């Protein structure tokens, strides 16, 4: 049974009576204390004043948890007594003890000293944490049991997690294998998906706040920084979190705020840390960490290889723009999850890496589905997919009636106090793995490839494109895509056979590319500037005006049922009256791009550029924008500001760096080298995989009766 979203926290006193143990908070609730030394959840932080990294003060401030006295051996409440057991750990404002009821059941008691209560504000914070945690009911979230108080302390009773945290696991093992991280990530995604469905943002997801139960399933705990949104569009503005895990929009969003995406970012940080051994933005001081986060300055060390599929997932999650991060549903569709997937985590995981090599592909898929079911992911994902199918259907209808296609754009915080695996030690949040296995036969390799391509196709959902009215035009475009895709596949085959002799390498010719563009399709159309300085506008009605840079002339291009496109050439001085408005729009965009946009390349017109070129089609995907030019060149502008163009029927690849450096190579030579020479940060192979899938999709002609 699904629960509705939580209501926003208000000032009314909370009823903390649990259904399991009827022991309400007694006395004046104004005496309750909040996490005051957890200053990050309330103060608008200057990054220079993080309490993890503050310079030495004249007088060291005592942690508020130190005010918490050891509870009596027998803790009496109304209707039920508890026997105090071992000390489990402490955080910034609370201490945690093991306690046992009369039946012998053991719990973790998060204990907050009343002496640390200084204001109504801190009381409300503690009540907020209690209310939010009490409302959570998910197999991968630490269960809230009860809340009560005595004369000295407030006690929050929680499900006990006897096997430590992910932080402890990483400290012991140094680095984890991809199969176990797939398992952990799936469970974490299930818990986050549930929280977000209740409009709850955790805001402090980190390895130290995720615990192991008795069966080594994960449980998210510590809701001290959690917030409830009144509605889906509400934003939060408090700078809070743990330095290594904090999202860039939290650091930079004083005016724009942050929302659910901060938890997605933290997931990406944890994923990287588990596979590499430390957080991606780790540095000696907090200011450097913050600067690296704001610049998305991280890389994958060569001495700790992870799969390309894992890198793609991490890079996408750690997108600077929150809107560009994949949703939890989209994350579960990534190819990476189709790798080896265990049925469970063995009890020896804390001391040694599990061996899952014998799990067959088919069983891995079964295990993955089973894990999603247990984490309550499948039900919510299925409804998301229904909505996605509706959007795709509506989009196909739009294209059939010749409209523009628009698709759905598309501080130490209690690191161990919920787990008896913790100690008094304050954890520091710093934190070929899976050798490539040979497949037994070609059939199995083909099955895996098909499964990966199916998932990749889901990533490449167009968010906008120009409408192609002519069926012959669609066939020409599909043929060009097919030709270029075959050229790439042929180059890959040549590379596997040892490459080509220099005499057979294709001659280097820099293609004409799009150097500037403006998408104004909500009114006029799509404007662009080519490396030849020619300016074009692809209007919403499908026609194009291309104004030449080296002559007072222009082309007017429209669809043709026999040729695909037909182009008419005019002198500017002899322009037809009906095209005057078109040229005014071209001039407007030319001035706009000159004033506001910089060229992405130094390429210009070469002597081998005999014909004028225009843009036939553009398509905006989440990973990149794809341009299809009339000379058969395909250009891909990726969201990380790297650009690639495939020309000469797939034989040549052009790379443009974020700093506008441009170079062209035979594709087979780049494949042989393994990356764009001199540009290891280009992530060439990952981008080529996306390019091939984009071309493959466009090779299929979709017609509507």
Swiss-Prot record:
Residues at which Zn(2+) binds: 553, 569, 609, 612
Localization: Cytoplasm, Cytoskeleton, Microtubule organizing center, Spindle pole body
Compositional bias ranges of the Basic and acidic residues kind: 41-53
Binding-site residues for ATP, renumbered to this chain: 88-96, 110
Documented EC number(s): 2.7.11.21
Source taxon at top rank: Eukaryota
GO terms under biological process: cell division; exit from mitosis; G2/M transition of mitotic cell cycle; meiotic spindle assembly; mitotic spindle organization; negative regulation of protein localization to nucleolus; positive regulation of mitotic spindle pole body separation; positive regulation of protein localization to cell division site involved in mitotic actomyosin contractile ring assembly
Disulfide-bond pairs as recorded: none
Catalytic residues as annotated in Swiss-Prot or TrEMBL: 204
Main location per the UniProt record: cytoplasm
Keywords tagged on the record: ATP-binding, Cell cycle, Cell division, Cytoplasm, Cytoskeleton, Kinase, Mitosis, Nucleotide-binding, Phosphoprotein, Repeat, Serine/threonine-protein kinase, Transferase
Keyword field contains Cell division: yes
Domain Protein kinase span(s) in chain numbering: 82-337
Function: Protein kinase required for the cell cycle where it is involved in mitotic exit. A component of the fear (CDC14 early anaphase release) network which promotes CDC14 release from the nucleolus during early anaphase. Phosphorylates SCC1/MCD1 and NET1.
Subunit structure: Interacts with CDC48; the interaction is likely to result in CDC5 degradation. Interacts with CSA1.
Protein's recorded name: Cell cycle serine/threonine-protein kinase CDC5/MSD2
Natural source organism: Saccharomyces cerevisiae (strain ATCC 204508 / S288c) (Baker's yeast)
Origin organism lineage: Eukaryota, Fungi, Dikarya, Ascomycota, Saccharomycotina
């Amino acid at each position: 049974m699904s629960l509705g979203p939580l209501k926003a926290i208000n000032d009314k006193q909370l009823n903390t009576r649990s259904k399991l143990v009827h022991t309400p908070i007694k006395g004046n609730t104004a005496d309750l204390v909040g996490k005051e030394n957890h200053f990050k959840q309330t103060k608008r932080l200057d990054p220079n004043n993080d309490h993890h990294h503050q310079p030495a003060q004249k007088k060291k401030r005592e942690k508020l948890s130190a005010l918490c006295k050891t509870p009596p051996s027998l803790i009496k409440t109304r209707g039920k007594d508890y026997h105090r057991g071992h000390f489990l750990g402490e955080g910034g404002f609370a201490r945690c003890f093991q306690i046992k009821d009369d039946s012998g059941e053991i719990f973790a008691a998060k204990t907050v000293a009343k002496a640390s209560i200084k204001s109504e504000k801190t009381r409300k914070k503690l009540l907020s944490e209690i209310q939010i945690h009490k409302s959570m009911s998910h197999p991968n979230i630490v269960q809230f049991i009860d809340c009560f108080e005595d004369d000295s302390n407030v006690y929050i009773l929680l499900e006990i997690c006897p096997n430590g945290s992910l932080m402890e696991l990483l400290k012991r093992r140094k680095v984890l294998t991809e199969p176990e991280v797939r398992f952990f990530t799936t469970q974490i995604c299930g818990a986050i998906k549930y929280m977000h469905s209740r409009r709850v943002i955790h805001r402090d997801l980190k390895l130290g706040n995720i615990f192991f139960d008795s069966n080594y399933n994960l449980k998210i705990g510590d809701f001290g920084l959690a917030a409830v949104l009144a509605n889906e569009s509400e934003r939060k503005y408090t700078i809070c979190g743990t330095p290594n895990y904090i999202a860039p929009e939290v650091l930079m969003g004083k005016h724009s705020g942050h929302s659910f995406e901060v938890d997605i970012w933290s997931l990406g940080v944890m994923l990287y840390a588990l596979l590499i051994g430390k957080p991606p933005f780790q540095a000696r001081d907090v200011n450097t960490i913050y600067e690296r986060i704001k610049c998305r300055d991280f890389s994958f060390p060569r001495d700790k290889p992870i799969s390309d599929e894992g890198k793609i997932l991490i890079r996408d999650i750690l997108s600077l723009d929150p809107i560009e991060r994949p949703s939890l549903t989209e994350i579960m569709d990534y190819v990476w999850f189709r790798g080896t997937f265990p049925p469970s985590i063995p009890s020896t995981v804390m001391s040694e890496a599990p061996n899952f090599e014998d799990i067959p592909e088919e069983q891995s898929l079964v295990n993955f589905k089973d894990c999603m079911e247990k984490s309550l992911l499948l039900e919510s994902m299925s409804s998301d997919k229904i909505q996605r199918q509706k959007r795709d259907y509506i989009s196909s209808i739009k294209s059939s009636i010749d409209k523009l296609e628009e698709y759905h754009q598309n501080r130490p915080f209690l690191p161990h106090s919920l787990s008896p695996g913790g100690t008094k030690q304050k954890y520091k949040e710093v934190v070929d793995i899976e050798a490539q296995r040979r497949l037994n036969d070609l059939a199995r390799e083909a099955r895996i490839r098909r499964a990966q391509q199916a998932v990749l196709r889901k990533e490449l959902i167009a968010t906008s494109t120009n409408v192609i009215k002519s069926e012959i035009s669609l066939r020409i475009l599909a043929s060009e895509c097919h030709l270029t895709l075959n050229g790439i596949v042929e180059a890959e085959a040549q590379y596997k056979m040892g490459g080509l002799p220099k005499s057979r390498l294709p001659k280097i010719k820099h293609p004409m590319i799009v150097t500037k563009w403006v998408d104004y399709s909500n009114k006029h159309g799509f404007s662009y500037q080519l490396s030849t300085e020619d300016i074009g506008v692809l209007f919403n009605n499908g026609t194009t005006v291309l104004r030449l840079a080296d002559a007072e002339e222009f082309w007017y291009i429209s669809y043709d049922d026999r040729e695909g496109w037909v182009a008419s050439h005019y002198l500017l001085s002899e322009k037809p009256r009906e095209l005057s408005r078109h040229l005014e729009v071209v001039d407007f965009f030319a001035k706009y791009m000159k004033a506001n946009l910089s060229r992405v390349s130094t390429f210009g017109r070469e002597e081998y550029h005999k014909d004028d070129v225009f843009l036939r089609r553009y398509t905006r995907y989440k990973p990149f924008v794809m341009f299809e030019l009339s000379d058969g060149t395909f250009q891909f502008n990726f969201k990380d500001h790297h650009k690639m163009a495939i020309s000469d029927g797939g034989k040549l690849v052009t790379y443009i760096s974020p700093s506008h450096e441009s170079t062209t190579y035979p594709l087979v030579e780049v494949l042989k080298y393994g990356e764009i020479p001199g540009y290891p940060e280009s992530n060439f192979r990952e981008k080529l995989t996306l390019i091939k899938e984009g071309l493959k999709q466009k090779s299929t002609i979709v017609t509507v009766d």
